[in-house]
Amino acid sequence: MAIDTVVLDIEGTVCPITFVKEKLFPYFLEKLPSFLSEISNFTSLQADDKDPIKAILSQLPEQIRTSKDSVLEYFNDLVRRDIKDPILKQLQGFIWKLGYENGDLKAPVYEDSIEFIKTFPSKTENKRIYIYSSGSIKAQILLFGYVDENGKSVDLNEYLSGYFDITTAGFKTQSSSYTKILEDIGKEHGGSVLFLSDNVLEVEAALEAGMESYVVVRPGNAPLTEDDKTKYKIITSLEQL
């Protein structure tokens, strides 16, 4: 069955895996203290607060939001352990948005990925691209809205048909998440849908759900075992599709 829909992972697939851990995460941790310093009472935060930071933090367990230091320590620990926490993702998305908008941040999407995203979609042939990342949908839209192309910031969101994250589809190593995506994009079968990721556990989950799925190998990605190399289809560039 011909592929008419591609679901893309982000880090390690369409942009360097180092961008998130060496640029986005440190930027978030650098800016977070100044935002927390503006809050005088962490115990009385409300979900309907007009301040988006306060509204996000109100979702934290009461035992965490006792003080600035407690909240800061909590998020530092989550980032250090790379925990995919929905509240953390919301907060990161808000702070990264400011960074993209003021020019501090620009996404280093691979040239082959930029070209693929621009050329694969076709309304006449009903070809579509979706994004599925552990980062929040807001963070995904931001990243693709501020892509570094030859030193200029370009917006690739117009080429994308939709986005999924752990709150809308589920965790990426669970096959049920890919079944949910197939349902949401109107696909009864996954044979015409290709999922690309650097993570073999995610690729395996997509295959279990009936999708086609390849492992993407990029500089800096975790090395594959010999078994992985024989078990999965592997590409090193989206030009190979």
From Swiss-Prot:
GO terms for cellular component: cytoplasm; nucleus. Substrate binds at residues 133-134, 172. InterPro entries: Enolase-ppase_E1 (IPR023943), ENOPH1_eukaryotes (IPR027511), HAD-like_sf (IPR036412), HAD_sf (IPR023214). Pathway: Amino-acid biosynthesis; L-methionine biosynthesis via salvage pathway; L-methionine from S-methyl-5-thio-alpha-D-ribose 1-phosphate: step 3/6; Amino-acid biosynthesis; L-methionine biosynthesis via salvage pathway; L-methionine from S-methyl-5-thio-alpha-D-ribose 1-phosphate: step 4/6. It comes from the Eukaryota. GO terms for molecular function: acireductone synthase activity; magnesium ion binding. Keywords: Amino-acid biosynthesis, Cytoplasm, Hydrolase, Magnesium, Metal-binding, Methionine biosynthesis, Nucleus. Mg(2+) binds at residues 9, 11, 198. CDD domains: HAD_EP (cd01629). It catalyses: 5-methylsulfanyl-2,3-dioxopentyl phosphate + H2O = 1,2-dihydroxy-5-(methylsulfanyl)pent-1-en-3-one + phosphate. Monomer. This is Enolase-phosphatase E1. It comes from Scheffersomyces stipitis (strain ATCC 58785 / CBS 6054 / NBRC 10063 / NRRL Y-11545) (Yeast). The gene is UTR4.
